[in-house]
């Protein structure tokens, strides 16, 4: 169409990450060409190299609260595709293309937390196939699911296995930080106070979110893929990231 846009290295890496997320959910498989699953009958035989997430719920956290969170799964994907020997080198390459400060895993975590979803919305013209459940700006709780694998019990499972679990992690972490305050030097206390304030904000945000999830989980909402993304997304608008 006469566009002079040249794809950047970041564009290429964003595409790779999108494909990796597709493999995590079973939309794509490294073992078959094209779409592996977009509704209908699930065929586990299509997945040998990367096994899709069983729950169709992948947490997106600002810290390593879950070993199977999206960063852990992405690292595993890079390892399976490109080999363990060059893993750190490849993660650094991904992080450098994305841009940002910190270790490669920190940069990748920051991307998933802040930019992945807006990139996904752009790619799919605001009709996302991966849905981001989000408690709000404090990042108290975030998790992705794949629309085509949605089941009516998804929210109930998310609430029990992930939201409650995250709340428990916050309680434990806060206790550890508050205990550390007792023996901390004045300079260290400033840092600890900051962390405590942040965690308290997140704990409050997730507490309110838990009530919203509970309300919807009890309804066991059905979706019809033929209705399209917009209609189905609207059913969960109170608990999903807003589409901008």
What are these regions (language model features)?
Residues 2-244:
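Terminal accessory regions of large proteins
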């Amino acid at each position: 169409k006469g566009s002079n846009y040249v794809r950047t290295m970041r564009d290429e890496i964003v595409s790779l990450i999108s494909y990796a997320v597709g493999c995590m959910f079973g939309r794509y498989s490294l073992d078959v060409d094209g779409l592996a699953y977009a509704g209908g009958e699930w065929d586990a035989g299509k997945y040998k190299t990367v096994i899709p997430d069983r729950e169709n719920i992948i947490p997106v956290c600002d810290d390593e609260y879950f070993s199977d969170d999206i960063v852990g799964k992405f690292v595993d994907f890079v390892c399976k595709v490109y080999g363990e020997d060059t893993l750190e080198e490849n993660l650094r390459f991904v992080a450098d293309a994305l841009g940002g400060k910190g270790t490669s895993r920190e940069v990748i975590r920051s991307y998933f937390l802040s930019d992945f979803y807006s990139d996904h919305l752009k790619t799919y013209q605001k009709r996302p196939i991966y849905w981001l459940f989000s408690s709000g700006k404090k990042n108290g709780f975030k998790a992705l699911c794949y629309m085509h694998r949605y089941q009516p019990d998804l929210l109930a499972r998310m609430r029990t296995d992930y939201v409650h679990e995250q709340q428990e992690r916050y309680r434990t972490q806060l206790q550890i930080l508050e205990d550390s305050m007792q023996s901390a030097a004045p300079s260290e206390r400033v840092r600890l106070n900051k962390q405590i304030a942040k965690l308290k904000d997140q704990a409050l945000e997730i507490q309110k979110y838990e009530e919203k999830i509970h309300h919807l989980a009890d309804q066991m909402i059905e979706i019809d893929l033929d209705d399209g993304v917009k209609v189905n997304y609207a059913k969960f608008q109170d608990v999903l990231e807003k589409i901008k």
